[in-house]
Amino acid sequence: MKRVLTALAAALPFAAHAADAISGAVEHQPTNWQAIIMFLIFVVFTLGITYWASKRVRSRSDYYTAGGNITGFQNGLAIAGDYMSAASFLGISALVFTSGYDGLIYSLGFLVGWPIILFLIAERLRNLGRYTFADVASYRLKQGPIRILSACGSLVVVALYLIAQMVGAGKLIELLFGLNYHIAVVLVGVLMMMYVLFGGMLATTWVQIIKAVLLLFGASFMAFMVMKHVGFSFNNLFTEAMAVHPKGTAIMSPGGLVQDPISALSLGLGLMFGTAGLPHILMRFFTVSDAREARKSVFYATGFMGYFYILTFIIGFGAIMLVGANPAYKDAAGALIGGNNMAAVHLANAVGGNLFLGFISAVAFATILAVVAGLTLAGASAVSHDLYANVFRKGATEREELKVSKITVLVLGVIAIILGVLFENQNIAFMVGLAFAIAASCNFPIILLSMYWSKLTTRGAMLGGWLGLLTAVVLMILGPTIWVQILGHEKAIFPYEYPALFSISVAFLGIWFFSATDNSAEGNREREQFRAQFIRSQTGFGVQQGRAH
């Protein structure tokens, strides 16, 4: 059955990743009952898991980190589920559909950050921290200021990510399911709160695992059917795609996506270092028992995500052949029905019929829930653990801390729903770019230098971290996306779309300069404590494991 999907503006490249940020107006669609039934099955099953998890959440450790008893394989699958989004699936395949080989290059940008996490961060992070990355950043530095900075960096990233997720969720669900936008946003918000409020990290982990399995299965089936169509020959795949694509052989050439070298470098640095500074990703490394399992988590996650991005490349070229060359998927003007971001959805219909289209639509919805649940838990832990229990109310009991965390979940959920409704017709794609830039410019430098640079002091971390955060925000506002496209000015003050190259440089230089010039007695004590921190980060001596974690 042909589904009529209305025109949808293509999201900015950053939105192709984890924001599910589908921008532009959409109209109410016919109800997709197959998708709704499949999604209801997923919801009932995951709510059952949440009920099961709620019976096992008895302590702060259980709530924040699932007691540290998630295996490396399970955590790797959950990390992949947390990182691979609906728009990663739709957006990257759409990028391949329109730009060919450049889409593969762009997708690699989201993978290059993982070797950094594997070799530089995962092991030491697990050995030094308990619940949040602020535990690591403040290990030998002054607790109050560093936790405030880390929590602010986390909350800004979470807020920007969450708004983009909620708006994108409403648009995507309205498009795929035929549900009203406001109903879709409220539904996502309520389910998100239920998962995190009652099941904590254990429920969130299993929602992410199930979503990852479903997404990998769906993408694998689509790629298999595409390869079957071309006799399992990549040569045939590329030859047929070039024959029908308007750009012809140019789709096999790189360099057309970001032609300015500074923008390309800035985009790459933002993707690479931003990944290593995302709070909801870093939090996952505390769910395993030790550093060895943390390393295994990254290994498995990288494997799953690498496989997924290879699948999106095949799906994108399959869409060129089976969707782009099929008039049934074009509107009267010759454009793809629903916009280029719907290329993978149309391909699902082409290779598996309406039933498989319903399955892919349900998986897209499940994907959104998995991502927002992880974001909400990261935001709640930043407020309850970093700010409440370690800054404003030192010595608070576990019960008090958990109460604050659950109140924060409710507040974040309500705010996310309200902002999701208010931003319905706004261009929110820039929020994902800003979230990555802040994660790369504030969170990542502090985490990295706190673990590796013996001369880091509280003064340097504070001033450099705030400089990086503010630089990223200011340059993003003055850049082409916000200053010209949103605010309507004729010319951008800052000429580049991605600020990461400059804001990361400012952060590292600021941290180095203000630490190097810090001759205070407190700064000298912090330098002396690095050796003890280094030994623990390398050996894990003193780290609590398992349920005692």
UniProtKB/Swiss-Prot annotation:
What family does this belong to?
Belongs to the sodium:solute symporter (SSF) (TC 2.A.21) family.
Q: Membrane-spanning residues where?
A: 33-53, 77-97, 103-123, 148-168, 183-203, 206-226, 262-282, 303-323, 355-375, 404-424, 428-448, 464-484, 493-513
Annotated membrane topology is: Multi-pass membrane protein
Which molecular function GO terms apply here? acetate transmembrane transporter activity; glycolate transmembrane transporter activity; symporter activity
Query: Where, per UniProt, does this protein localize?
Result: Cell inner membrane
GO annotation, biological process: plasma membrane acetate transport; sodium ion transport
What cellular component terms from Gene Ontology apply here?
Answer: plasma membrane
Q: Gene3D superfamilies under this entry?
A: Sodium/glucose cotransporter
Tell me the keywords, alphabetical order.
Cell inner membrane, Cell membrane, Ion transport, Membrane, Sodium, Sodium transport, Symport, Transmembrane, Transmembrane helix, Transport
What is the official name of this protein in its record? Cation/acetate symporter ActP
Q: What does this protein do?
A: Transports acetate.
